[in-house]
Amino acid sequence: MFPPSGSTGLIPPSHFQARPLSTLPRMAPTWLSDIPLVQPPGHQDVSERRLDTQRPQVTMWERDVSSDRQEPGRRGRSWGLEGSQALSQQAEVIARQLQELRRLEEEVRLLRETSLQQKMRLEAQAMELEALARAEKAGRTEAEGLRAALAGAEVIRKNLEEGSQRELEEVQRLHQEQLSSLTQAHEEALSSLTSKAEGLEKSLSSLETRRAGEAKELAEAQREAELLRKQLSKTQEDLEAQVTLVENLRKYVGEQVPSEVHSQTWELERQKLLETMQHLQEDRDSLQATVELLQVRVQSLTHILALQEEELTRKVQPSDSLEPEFTRKCQFLLNRWREKVFALMVQLKAQELEHSDSVKQLKGQVASLQEQVTSQSQEQAILQRSLQDKAAEVEVERIGAKGLQLELSRAQEARHRWQQQTASAEEQLRLVVNAVSSSQIWLETTMAKVEEAAAQLPSLNNRLSYAVRKVHTIRGLIARKLALAQLRQESCPLPPPVADVSLELQQLREERNRLDAELQLSARLIQQEVGRAREQGEAERQQLSKVAQQLEQELQQTQESLASLGLQLEVARQGQQESTEEAASLRQELTQQQELYGQALQEKVAEVETQLREQLSDTERRLNEARREHAKAVVSLRQIQRRAAQEKERSQELRRLQEEARKEEGQRLARRLQELERDKNLMLATLQQEGLLSRYKQQRLLTVLPSLLDKKKSVVSSPRPPECSASAPIAAAVPTRESIKGSLSVLLDDLQGLSEAISKEEAVCQGDNLDRCSSSNPQMSS
């Protein structure tokens, strides 16, 4: 026995307890904690891969353990080798158990997959059964629809018969209504024509009254124009007389008055004349405005004839006393021209009235014919619409027959499809029966496998319990060996390196504690996995039993549904035969009805065609008559238009000749006026040369200044001294100047009156020039 090395008595049990691990690399492998309790089938491959990757970790851990065991020294190799062998055996046992667990998991996954496939097959079979039920319902509904279509065809046939009778009655009623409406329209047209004739007569009377009023207004306007012409001629004569007086006075004043007095008087006269000119310009503006207003009034009241007459009267003035024959000729020509124009106007008015009457008559005839044509076209449209309605009804009947034929064809197609569906349903039922039998066999085999696995579970439990006991024994042996090794170390002399021994002890203790923890953890994990496998197997067994029961129930239901489907197929076949027979009878009835309706429609169409032909012949006859009357009216209108055009051409030719004559007369009068002005200028020049004007001025001065002449004589006869002989002419000159001043005041008054007359004359001359310009403008335009 080795003596104790420092401590007396027995070793306490706390010495063999597990201590906290201090180093991380000597911990148990982490792959044991990563194993799931129940792995789904989708993640089994992942778990297998994880285990495959963790196997080298186990080997590495074993190597580490073996290397750790070799480190302490030669003294503890014997018990370390024994512990490593035991651990390797335990690891092999654990690996075998893990392989068995994997195999069980694979079997469970296969069972789940097969159960899912069976569920899918059963669901597909249920869907097929539902489709068969739907097809059966569709066949029933189609049979009911065929029956309803047959009933509807009978109702349509009855409705068509009733509709044909109603249409005949409506056609008769419409014919009577059309006749009554035509008579009413004819009466209304007659009444409207009479009312139109009365209105036209009233309008004619009103037009005649208007024409009479316009003639009166024209006569009044002509009278006013003649008065204005007379006034203008008088004013022109007065102006000419005043112009001559003014010229004479100017000449007299220029000869008698000296230069200085003449300049002073001239300035005064110029100022007064400027003032008078301003007044005269204002008066002239007002007179021009009044003259323009009068001209507008004359132009609005009179026609082109009045303007031409006015021009002729203006050109031929009564003051022209040198050519009385020319004035008489102009007056005679003007009167003849007036008479011709009046006759032409009367003829044109009569022709216009006749033309308007004929046009109104023709318009009335055309309107009546148009009304007749519109009424006949309406009748024709009504008949055409009735024909279209009947044709539409026939088409509707044809469409209904086509629809029935289509329904029959659809029914046949549905029957054919029903037969195909029944055949396919029978085949599917056979397939379902085979699939159910095969699935039942497979379930039985899987249940046997599951029972075998459940029978193997107690043996596995025994193995696990044996392994746990073995682990406990190994743990006790290891503890005993460790205690013995410690006693030996204590009894042995201390080696020189105390630190190495203490380190080895700590490492051994740590390794012991780690191995204990690993063994406990592995035992716990194995127990958990076994419990999970048991629970999973029992749950899957229960599920499979439930699925088997459900499949048996579904098989019973499918067999029952197959039996009912067979009965329904027989019923459907019988109904199909009945429907085919009914369809054949309906086809025969439809052909008969089509023949009857075709005959009736042909008869109706023939009657309507005869009526329409008669009406068309009547309308054509009336249209031909209307066309003839219209052609006659057009011919008469063209004749009237030709006459009117000829008369218009004649009137235009007359106007052109009259204008040419008037232009020639105007030119001749202008030349005559120029000659008269030239003669007047010559007369004035001769008078000035002979001194007649100076004599008139002297006589005027003598009459104005008698007193001055008397005084002059007294002064000349009185004795004068010789001293005053030189001042005598000066004294004589003074009274002559004073007398000249008085005579000048009188002359200025006269000149004011003459200037006023001259301004009036100039205004009148300007108005005449404006009238001539206005008269020349329409002549140029014409």
UniProtKB/Swiss-Prot annotation:
It is found in: Cytoplasm; Nucleus. Residues 82-314, 344-435, 498-691 form a coiled coil. One of its GO terms (biological process) is cell differentiation. Residues 62-82, 191-218 are annotated as: Disordered. It comes from Pongo pygmaeus (Bornean orangutan). Residues 62-74, 208-218 have a biased composition (Basic and acidic residues). Its main location: cytoplasm. May be a regulator of keratinocyte proliferation or differentiation. The keyword DNA damage does not apply. The keyword Cytoplasm applies. Keywords: Coiled coil, Cytoplasm, Developmental protein, Differentiation, Nucleus. GO terms for cellular component: centriole; cytoplasm; nucleus. This is Coiled-coil alpha-helical rod protein 1.
